[in-house]
């Protein structure tokens, strides 16, 4: 860090401030997105606020897709059940359109469950905007800030503000980062979560006890802290899909598109041939427009029309690791501002553990990507320079890789320079493809895709987009203190076994977990725990209850053991060995819910074990409640 960098930052800040002017506080999408809705939105909000409301059954959803014939098609058929695809389904159905969605695996089974768990407010775009005097990058900052704010408000039980600390071992670094983040505060305006601030070295150590006092022969001068958003990504994705289902969309996971249907006369895409991967049954489902939101696999959908289609996806691998809770204090993240190859690495508290990452490298597209050992070691090396504790490979509880579907730029030489922004295009009539983007902006991406679908199919929505102000399932009536109701009602419950009275398994930690994972639906899970004898924990040291398996099977389209351990409950991501120990009981409960025979139970166990093998934990490490023994 140099004086020249600080001068350049100051000069760029002045130009950006002058260029943006009053637009800093402008939020043009709010007014347009808050219009309309009418009876459709009113009805949905009543269902979302009804604690007894349930999504349609899986068989009913499949029947609705089959009922979409050539003479009576859907308005929109979405391929892909990740954040973008589920967002498209929710946007379209709340505009009064007839909507279907199919996902070949599970909601959030791909990239959407393998994120850094951050809802970025575009702080890195601001740095590029300042140094490159790029107003386009500044607009991305405005957009990310607005979408972050709305996402946190629309799913408050799953999203929250998180302070992130940047260590400074040079006074120039202190000035540089402080100036940059104060400019960020100014640009954020009413979208700001909390003001950034400087902490002295002593204050920083009190806030983050494992922070290194020295780095590269320099003493810690202090830290600069700003706030970003954090989320439970896959549960947010499942919430999107279930909200869309409650609104009337026919959503079906474990349903794969095997081919697209083309009108022989017009050559327009008019539907898809779909295979139910649980039963093997195939059927046609027709639609006026098909939206390809298959993430890293969107090129494979495009190639169903033309095998020679030029790829639009540049796949990038992002690896994360999970460490015990003592690596980071609860409620404070750490940013490694520059690794040996110039990247940024985050170390964040998440669901009682610490998640660290990520990497950024070219990769091939696969349904179950695996982290390489050198990528895991890269992250460990990056954080070790900033911590005063020994960072060990044996502390890794879980490690996973996700594939970012970056929009291809043929002139780019590395994935870091390829745009993270999204692209919507229609190269074949009737097939709208959306790719790129990031979790933070999924909602506006979906809005753009639905706008394109309406134009393509000359559809007639009953109202404009309403998703900006639409709270998701579990959000209505939820408060941060909602867990206390669960604690007071269920913590002291007693059960009698053979005349011996023992306390129920639910404690305050479990009550907090249920409240944040399920929001206002948590009471239904607690009731199952109490009334059906499913109050035991699935794995020691984790708050997940047996009742969650039953609830997710009944109300969240949980159709496999992997669906549960990876995406309904996050135990596979948090602690691979604990997930393996919980597997048998998870399969037993799912078997009871779905009437599986012994053969199916054996298959589920094997598939789940193979899935867990892709999470590179430390087999020789022994943990208890996230602490190393």
UniProtKB/Swiss-Prot annotation:
Record keywords, A-Z: FAD, Flavoprotein, Membrane, Mitochondrion, Mitochondrion inner membrane, Oxidoreductase, Transit peptide
Domain of life: Eukaryota
Gene3D superfamilies tied to this protein: Alpha-glycerophosphate oxidase, cap domain, D-Amino Acid Oxidase, subunit A, domain 2, FAD/NAD(P)-binding domain
EC number: 1.1.5.3
Membrane topology field: Peripheral membrane protein
Keyword Glycoprotein: no
Tissue-level expression: Expressed in germinating seedlings. Also detected in roots, leaves, flowers, developing siliques and germinating seeds.
Xref: InterPro entries: DAO_C, DAO_C_sf, FAD-dep_OxRdtase, FAD/NAD-bd_sf, G3P_DH_FAD-dep
Binding site for FAD: 75-103
Principal EC category: oxidoreductase
Pfam family, one: DAO_C
One MF annotation (Gene Ontology) recorded for this entry: glycerol-3-phosphate dehydrogenase (quinone) activity
Family: Belongs to the FAD-dependent glycerol-3-phosphate dehydrogenase family.
Miscellaneous note of the record: Plants lacking SDP6 are impaired in gluconeogenesis during postgerminative growth.
Stated name of the protein: Glycerol-3-phosphate dehydrogenase SDP6, mitochondrial
